[in-house]
Amino acid sequence: MPAIVLIGAQWGDEGKGKATDLLGGSVQWVVRYQGGNNAGHTVVLPNGENFALHLIPSGILTPGVTNVIGNGVVVDPGVLLTELAGLEERGIDTSGLILSADAHLLMPYHVAIDKVTERYLGSKKIGTTGRGIGPCYQDKVARIGIRVADVLDEESLRQKVHAALEFKNQVLVKIYNRKALDPDQVVDGVLEQAEGFKHRIADARLQLNQALERGETVLLEGSQGTLLDVDHGTYPFVTSSNPTAGGASVGSGIGPTRITTVLGILKAYTTRVGSGPFPTELFDEHGAYLAKTGGEVGVTTGRARRCGWFDAVIARYATRVNGITDYFLTKLDVLSSLQTVPICVGYEVDGKRTNEMPMTQSEIYRATPVYEELPGWWEDISGARQFEDLPAKAQDYVLRLEELAGAPMSCIGVGPGRDQTIVRRDILSRS
């Protein structure tokens, strides 16, 4: 079987965990291919149990699935161990989790530099989570990073950490007036943590390709979203990796020709956490309604999410840059009881209408949304399990989004639970 990529089509927080959980029973492998513990997935099981995952793939909650933290991920050892312990305390079997030997380790100095840099930037800060993700990726690209496999060779690990801190301590002390970190203490701490995950280190790319050759199905799970991609997002207000579909191949070691289905996750409205442009952002009672009804608080940061109407411009953009074949529309139920539901179908920039994503950030900031208003519905749709169960006006809304986004809305979420999903098309049958 080929591989399936699952990506966020907005600014993250679209409900990717729900989608992964739904598909988990039909796949044998779930792979996290980029990012770190700067994003969160929320999964609600049929029994009502709620799980918030930050680093471990959502497939960990499905028995029999092998979960992989791929080479494109940056791994905070402490967060990994804490998350594993939390799952095990709740009776979840974590024995099926493996860790790519080539994933990079997030070190204490990455967190320290991230925090002081944001503080130093003040009003010009990017709005990072302060968890060291960006500095860790910087080291990876600069070829001075620490890989997971380095914990298997203490002498080599010490040499690498000493070399890294020769420069980083200069930055911390002379630029930011902070205390220097002791390289041996850093190494000792990491080696102690490694005792809890060394047995999980594996040649993940080999195992994944062998699984595909055996006819098994691999689900590649991205974190964040398309508009946070370092290349294709609203730069510089982006993450430090590639959540887009192209990053799935690089971050897992699976060749692009193995991937035949790209499932985009779209919220029925739009949210964003942190700084950056957001053309449809609402500052009125409608924004407050979406935030309250949708429970729009970041899983990882605890920060309130900015809320706005659905933006078809960024949906079309996401379809294009990811090659999206299907969409999973989430939180449609949140829109119930609104008299009208506006959809942004284009922008006006400097007096000119455009239906495409502006080329520059300054243009995005100046973009005024052009809205098309659809009539709302008042019915409770949380019990709908077939598309025909939805009120006619809710159906019209979904079909209009499908037309504007340029790919079918194959699944529709009408509540947080795994079972609160309408499946219009079998995504796996396309693979």
UniProtKB/Swiss-Prot annotation:
UniProt GO BP: 'de novo' AMP biosynthetic process; IMP metabolic process
InterPro entries for the chain: Adenylosuccin_syn_GTP-bd, Adenylosuccin_syn_Lys_AS, Adenylosuccinate_synth_dom1, Adenylosuccinate_synth_dom2, Adenylosuccinate_synth_dom3, Adenylosuccinate_synthetase, P-loop_NTPase
Main location: cytoplasm
Cofactors that this protein relies on: Mg(2+)
Associated pathway: Purine metabolism; AMP biosynthesis via de novo pathway; AMP from IMP: step 1/2
Active site as annotated: D13, H41
Binding site for Mg(2+): D13, G40
Protein name (Swiss-Prot/TrEMBL): Adenylosuccinate synthetase
Gene: purA
